[in-house]
Regions:
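A short, glycine-centered helix-capping/turn motif at helix boundaries
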Residues: 16-29, 122-125, 134-135
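Bulky hydrophobic/aromatic "packing anchor" residues in well-ordered structure
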Residues: 1, 75-76, 117
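Residue-level marker of regulatory loop/turn positions in helix-turn-helix DNA-binding domains and
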Residues: 5-6, 16, 85, 105, ...
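Conserved tyrosine-mediated DNA breakage-rejoining catalytic core shared by Y-recombinases
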Residues: 20, 25-60
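Short, basic (Lys/Arg/His-rich) helix/loop patches that form interaction surfaces
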Residues: 91-125, 132, 136, 150
Length: 159
């Protein structure tokens, strides 16, 4: 909807919250230099972590910065060059939700972050399951190769 309405900044805001999982307070950390590097160093509770940017998002952010004439500093800023406030970010996203006929309660940066976290947890759960299945198959193949195709209880029952 944001692209149709030609609200590229709002489109990128939604995308960065949903794909990178950053908080609104971490938005000033999204600078042209850090986007070029492909990861955002953010502080969470005194701890420093790095948020990787997906290549598609990185390309779109760099294109946006180039079109806006930004060579350094924050990617998301007002016409005056100041960083966007929390209320301004939330208001833009909720206006988009209203235009797209999506519940405004679901169109907050916090909800988009929750979407990111839920999606990530689901992907991690799927990867864990695949790793377990792969490990089980590897053990089965190894047992067949060594000749342990039957369990000791099965051998006793066969005699």
């Amino acid at each position: 909807a944001a692209r149709i309405l030609e609200k590229e900044r709002t489109y990128l805001l939604v995308k960065i919250f949903a794909l990178a999982g950053i908080r609104v307070g971490e938005l000033p950390q999204v600078t042209v230099e850090r986007v070029r590097a492909g990861r955002l160093p953010v502080r969470t509770g005194g701890e420093r972590r790095y948020v990787p940017l997906p290549a598609c998002l990185q390309g779109e952010l760099l294109d946006y910065a180039r079109r806006q004439g930004l060579t350094a500093g924050p990617v998301f800023c007002t016409r005056n060059g100041k960083g966007m406030s929390r209320t301004q970010v939330t208001e833009e996203i909720q206006t988009l939700c209203h235009n797209a006929r999506v519940e405004e309660e679901k169109g907050t940066p916090r909800c988009l972050r929750k979407l990111y976290l839920a999606t990530r947890a689901e992907v991690e759960r799927g990867v864990r399951l695949l790793a377990e299945q792969s490990y089980e198959r590897m053990l089965d193949t190894e047992q067949l190769a060594v000749g342990w195709d039957e369990l000791p209880e099965q051998k006793k029952a066969a005699q």
